[in-house]
């Protein structure tokens, strides 16, 4: 297979962690895993090795998560963080439907495409001013006020301001655009329905402050994976025996959990993923 810029023979495994990078599940992608999930079809390799790797990752994700939540029914997280390899419509539908996540922080792998509604959208799925595609509209509110109660995201004219009326002590929207795209005094309003395009609106506005702050947490996951490779010596193995590698991988996970327990007991939480400083 093709991994990180070179061809190699390798055994693949999947790790599920929490937001702290603490391992919660390890799945070895061996024959037993494929036998337990016959819906996973190993297709012929394409002309793009990188694409093959992404397809393999995306196909393994849902079976791993389904198995995990079946084993741990009391664990019910609402936020999913993953890389761009998981940017597929099928995965979004499963995450929000069958599995029950409310937000999915997954970078786009392919540019968004939307139907023509008289306005354009930017790379984050935010509608732009019909007269100026470089001017994104402003998000307003996070809950639906429509009678249908269908979840919506409301965007308003970026040149709209709330003004206070001293006479009747009320606030109203006033559009201060020199070239308005609507006759409404409060400016253009656009409602989008996330369920119609989960890639564009995965429970959170792409590019927002919430998106940027939350996705930073994924750094913990990358650090955890590096600790498995380096501190727990999973990388650069000499043996090619599958059972030995599988056992060593599980022991590495156990070692990390022991590290977490010890760090917690001695109140050194900064070392929950750092074995070497903890024993130094």
What is the predicted function of each stretch?
Residues 84, 108-109:
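Active-site proximal loops enriched in glycine and acidic residues that flank catalytic Cys/His/Asp
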Residues 213-280:
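Basic, amphipathic alpha-helical segments enriched in Lys/Arg and hydrophobic/aromatic residues
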Residues 99-108:
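Short hydrophobic/aromatic-enriched beta-strand-loop microsegments
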Residues 1-84, 88-97:
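Polybasic low-complexity intrinsically disordered regions
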